[in-house]
Design a protein with these regions (language model features):
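Short acidic-glycine-tyrosine-enriched beta hairpin
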Residues: 63-78
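Glycine- and acidic-residue-biased ligand/ion/polar-headgroup-sensing regions
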Residues: 45-56, 61
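A short, N-terminal "cap"/entry segment at the start of jelly-roll beta-barrel domains
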Residues: 1-24
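Ligand-binding loop in jelly-roll beta-barrel domains
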Residues: 78-102
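Conserved hydrophobic/aromatic beta-strand scaffold that supports enzyme active sites
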Residues: 18, 27-29, 48, 73-75, ...
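Conserved short histidine dyad/triad with adjacent acidic residue
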Residues: 26-43
Length: 103
């Protein structure tokens, strides 16, 4: 078999899983319930964030918080302060791709 297969969690429970973390790319899957979020941090690579379901609430650097619905794709440059949260009623599910892979 040439391809590699990776399974991701399903459901509504808080999940942060590193699906792929190699020398080329980091591919992360996240599930956040209402009022859950990530610790504030700085992006350590270019970040491509896809909202699969729910609404993403995100504050970047000193901007106001913005909301993004399912099927939104955000491209965030390296070195940006990020505050990622689920302020909505629905479960938030995201795919986060970091490319190139952080060193």
């Amino acid at each position: 078999m040439i391809e590699q297969i990776f399974q991701m969690a399903q459901g509504n429970e808080f999940t942060i899983e590193k699906v792929i973390a190699d020398e080329n790319v980091h591919f992360n899957h996240m599930i956040l319930g209402k009022n859950e979020g990530l610790p504030e941090h700085f992006s350590n690579s270019n970040v491509y964030m896809t909202v699969l379901r729910g609404n993403l609430s995100i504050t970047l650097d000193d901007q106001d918080t913005h909301e993004y619905p399912a099927c939104s794709l955000l491209k965030i440059p390296m070195g940006i302060k990020m505050n990622v949260r689920n302020l909505g009623e629905e479960t938030l599910e995201l795919i986060v791709v970091k490319a190139p892979a952080p060193k």
